[in-house]
Amino acid sequence: GGKEGYPLNSSNGCKSGRFAGTNSNENTECKGXDAENGY
């Protein structure tokens, strides 16, 4: 992880929170922040 991610229910399926999980797309698609969690 290390990138800020979108919520799990978003179109790209990334994990929520400041540190995205082991999603294969985390470095290319988990950009921006998770507004709901204030990141």
Swiss-Prot record:
Main location: secreted
Keywords: Disulfide bond, Ion channel impairing toxin, Neurotoxin, Secreted, Toxin, Voltage-gated sodium channel impairing toxin
InterPro entries: LCN-type_CS_alpha_beta_dom
GO molecular function, one term: ion channel inhibitor activity
Domain of life: Eukaryota
Any single GO CC term annotated in Swiss-Prot or TrEMBL for this entry: extracellular region
Domain LCN-type CS-alpha/beta: start-end pairs: 3-39
Tissue: Expressed by the venom gland.
PROSITE patterns: LCN_CSAB
Keyword Thylakoid recorded: no
Basic and acidic residues: compositionally biased ranges: 28-39
Localization per Swiss-Prot or TrEMBL: Secreted
Residue numbers spanned by region Disordered: 1-39
Family of the protein in this entry: Belongs to the long (4 C-C) scorpion toxin superfamily. Sodium channel inhibitor family. Beta subfamily.
Free-text comment on this protein's domains from its UniProt entry: Has the structural arrangement of an alpha-helix connected to antiparallel beta-sheets by disulfide bonds (CS-alpha/beta).
Job of this protein: Beta toxins bind voltage-independently at site-4 of sodium channels (Nav) and shift the voltage of activation toward more negative potentials thereby affecting sodium channel activation and promoting spontaneous and repetitive firing.
Protein known as: Putative beta-neurotoxin
